[in-house]
Amino acid sequence: MKGFIAYIPAGFPDLETTRKILIALNELGITGVEIGVPFSDPVADGPVIQLAHSVALRNGVTMKKILEMLGEISVDYDLYLMSYLNPIVNYPEGKEKLLDELKKLGVKGLIIPDLPLREVKNVNIAYPIVPFVAPNTKDEEIEFINSVQAPFVYYISRYGVTGEREDLPFADHIKRVKERIKLPLFVGFGISRHEQVEKVWEIADGAIVGSALVRIMEESPKDEIPKKVVEKVKELLGK
């Protein structure tokens, strides 16, 4: 099995359910989990994940509470924090305190959707930041990625916001990017079926799935959410 990263929105429908999901996913041998930090203006996310953000915010979920929850669990897969820039730079105890806490928790990297590739080195965040590549990313920017320290590169396989799609476009471009970068290449945005995961595995190092899992969470009774998420991930992995 190649790489697989699941996106789980923290605090949807509540942090206790998030904790149970993270523990339940530990049995599947996946590469990692992106922990989504709720934000009031999630511009890169589609309606499914936007709803999860709004529910979590109404429930009073904060960055600090997310870190406390992560401190209560131990998992074998890699943890990544997916957050818009604002909650990071405006952390109440200061950005450096946040980064120190993330390091103690073993978080492998930050995924910041509203941080342009060229700005990564200018925001003064001393932590591995996952760069994004899209079908319209210029060649010189792809070369720039090789100068960035990061756990992997996140390829956005569709223009626009997150959400489930039927096809996997830009396969040729994904292959070209894969040939030119030194870091592992993971493809996300729109993957919802095992067949799509397999197509990604053929041309990249791993797949990232978000909206398909969040939809399962939205459609399931709260006490069944961890089990239903595990079942969906197994389906995506072909297990």
Curated annotation (Swiss-Prot):
Record-given protein name: Tryptophan synthase alpha chain
Q: Enzyme group, top EC level?
A: lyase
Active-site residues, record numbering mapped to chain: E34 (proton acceptor), D45 (proton acceptor)
Residues in a coiled coil are none
Instruction: State the Gene Ontology terms under molecular function.
Output: tryptophan synthase activity
For this protein, the record's NCBIfam families field holds: trpA
What are its E.C. numbers? Answer: 4.2.1.20
**Cross-referenced PROSITE patterns, in alphabetical order?**
TRP_SYNTHASE_ALPHA (PS00167)
Q: Does the keyword Amino-acid biosynthesis apply?
A: yes
* Catalysed conversion reaction: (1S,2R)-1-C-(indol-3-yl)glycerol 3-phosphate + L-serine = D-glyceraldehyde 3-phosphate + L-tryptophan + H2O
Gene Ontology CC: cytosol
Subunit text: Tetramer of two alpha and two beta chains.
Q: Name one Pfam family in it.
A: Trp_syntA
Q: Which family does it belong to?
A: Belongs to the TrpA family.
Q: Which domain of life is it from?
A: Bacteria
Keyword Magnesium part of the UniProt annotation: no
What pathway is this protein a component of? Amino-acid biosynthesis; L-tryptophan biosynthesis; L-tryptophan from chorismate: step 5/5
| Known function | The alpha subunit is responsible for the aldol cleavage of indoleglycerol phosphate to indole and glyceraldehyde 3-phosphate.
Q: Which UniProt keywords apply?
A: Amino-acid biosynthesis, Aromatic amino acid biosynthesis, Lyase, Tryptophan biosynthesis
